[in-house]
Every structure is written in structure tokens, then in C-alpha cells.
Amino acid sequence: MFVDNIRIFARAGKGGNGLVSFRRAKFVPKGGPDGGDGGDGGSVILEVDPHTNDLRSFFYDPKLIATDGVGGQSAKKHGKNGKSVIGKVPPGTIIYRSNASSMAEATWLEREGEGIELEKIADLTEIGTRFTLCQGGLGGKGNWHFRSATNQAPTEAEMGTEGEEGVFFMELRRIADAGLVGYPNAGKSTLLGDISEAKPKVASYPFTTLQPIIGVVEFDSFRRCVVADIPGIIEGAHNNRGLGHEFLRHITRCKVLVFVLDMAGSEGRDPIEDLQNLRTEIKLYSEDLAKQPWFVVANKMDLEGAEENLANFRMRFPKVDIIPISALNGDGISRLRNRLDELVGYKFIR
């Protein structure tokens, strides 16, 4: 199961109350105030974890609850702080705060068609980043703090403050340098397996890829890039047909788009129409995404009719950068890897 968006409830701990207490000891019948401070409530924290691939950990238990701080004690002893809770999220997670005060209210708003207002509060892309989703409440001060020359026996102490809470939406947008875009059965999964260490499911029927898959492409001289393969796009994807939005959002961070076309025209497809339609879907979904650099991978060049279709394709799109390949037998893969290195390759330290 792959989960790339989820609604959760989060609540930080309440601060412990300060204590009203007076020192009582042998030979000290009227000791001064000694009430300690309450402990701070635990916070709810999100941490970007490189080993977390999606948001499935929140699917069956969509809540993060921190513990309350403990009240102050006598002898000026500070109450124990509440324990913070840390939720692991993958790189590329966007956090939204909703206007719903509870999960029940959020469900009601959705069911009644009222709509939920969302405020973007974080875009977590850097590994190791910690983001405080809900701040724990502060512990109250004990009566020891309220002593004065005119009030040596204060009976006042502070209450701990409430911790923050709310309903939040988390959305995963994969982080990749290049995104493979194409129709179902265009050969994207086979291609990703050829150029990287990814092991996507491959079969000769459409929609083999049912979730975004990330592959790391290693080059010479300690260089690499990250490539995302999203499930095949269909007409109307920009309107969320076929869960288009669920898939397209995973390539919004890509620096270059790679349109993978079945140049042999298998299943009666026309490569020229395919490119035009794919470009249209991308533009209708996001003008900014459509402005990103792109090139075409002409796949299935080992099949009958591919050479003739490629010649017609070049005549129709004379300025488009085209790399002919056969993902099945490996022809053209080296040239594709070189192009990716030129466009988005970067140095890394092992």
C-alpha cells in the first residue's frame, strides 16, 4: 500500500500546574513558599527521514499525541516535562493546517460539501529537518516565584498553558531531478530499471505502475541523479481523471521532464498525437511545470514501424531533442544516461 496524502490529528501536551506549597520542617513551623514549577508539555514534531518512503505509518493510526507536563512539587522541585512525540515523514512532504478543530468536524465539512480551508505551513525537503507541528504548553510557576517583601506567604501559583492542537493534512510530492512522463504501457518502468537500480514491476499490460517509483542513476566521477516514474497519464489527467492529480504532483519538483513515447505505435497509438496530448495535460495542470526543460525518448525502436514513425515525428517536431532507444534490448541507453548527466547530474559523496 502506498499512501501519499493523509489527514491527521495532532495535540501537544498541556503544561503542568505550578504548586502552592510552604516549607514544613522541624523547628521551622512557618517556612516560606517552596512550590515548584510545572513541567512543560511535550511537543508534536515531524522529522524528515530518508528511510521513510510514504505516509502509510499514519494510515491506521492518524494521530500524534504528546504527553502533559507534570505539576510542580514541594521543595521547589520542578515537575517532569511531558514527552514529545516524533512522526517520521519522507522528503518532499508538504504540511497544511486545516480550519477544522477535530477529525469529526473535518469529516463533516467534507461530507456536507462545505470544504476545508487549508493553510500551507511547511514544505519538508531536507533530510534530518525537524518541524514543530504543535508546541507543548508551558508549565506554570509555583508560589515560590510570587514572594515579596509585602507578601511572604503567597497563595498564588500559575496554571500550565494548553498545548497546541489541530487537524493537519500531509501531502507527499516526490523529490526527483527528472520525471518520466508517458501513456500506460509506453515502457517507462522497463526504462527506469535499465538506467537505475530501481526494480519496478514490469508487464505487458497498461497501468503496471500504480504508484510513483524513484530510481537513482549513477554516473562516472561520483555523479548521480534521481529519476521518478509516475503511473501512466491518460487524457483528462489535469482534471484528476484517472487520479491524474495524485500522479502529476509527484513531478512538480522535477528539473527536467522526459516524455517516453511508444514510437512503434503499438496498440494503435500515434506518437505525434501522444506528445501533443501529454504536453497539453502538463500545461493544463501547471503552467510552471510546462515551462521546465524537456526532451523525448523514442522507445520501442526495435519494433516494426518505429523507424518510419520516427522519421515522421522528426519532420513534425524538428526542434525537439529526441533520443531513440529500445528499453527492451538496451539500445540507446548510454546516450540517455549521458543526457541526464548533462542536464541534472550532480556530484555526491559516498
Swiss-Prot record:
GO BP term (any one): ribosome biogenesis
Keywords annotated in UniProt: Cytoplasm, GTP-binding, Hydrolase, Magnesium, Metal-binding, Nucleotide-binding
Binding positions for GTP per the UniProt entry: 182-189, 207-211, 229-232, 299-302, 326-328
UniProt keyword annotation of GTP-binding present: yes
Domain annotation Obg: ranges: 1-175
Domain OBG-type G, chain residue ranges per copy: 176-345
GO molecular function: GTP binding; GTPase activity; magnesium ion binding
Transmembrane segments: none
Superkingdom classification of source: Bacteria
Binding site for Mg(2+): S189, T209
Gene Ontology annotations for the cellular component aspect, listed alphabetically: cytoplasm
Cofactor(s) named in the record: Mg(2+)
The enzyme's E.C. designation: 3.6.5.-
InterPro entries: G_OBG (IPR031167), GTP-bd (IPR006073), GTP-bd_Obg/CgtA (IPR014100), GTP1_OBG_dom (IPR006169), GTP1_OBG_dom_sf (IPR036726), OBG_GTPase (IPR045086), P-loop_NTPase (IPR027417), Small_GTP-bd (IPR005225)
Function description: An essential GTPase which binds GTP, GDP and possibly (p)ppGpp with moderate affinity, with high nucleotide exchange rates and a fairly low GTP hydrolysis rate. Plays a role in control of the cell cycle, stress response, ribosome biogenesis and in those bacteria that undergo differentiation, in morphogenesis control.
Name used for this protein in its record: GTPase Obg
Annotated organism of origin: Akkermansia muciniphila (strain ATCC BAA-835 / DSM 22959 / JCM 33894 / BCRC 81048 / CCUG 64013 / CIP 107961 / Muc)
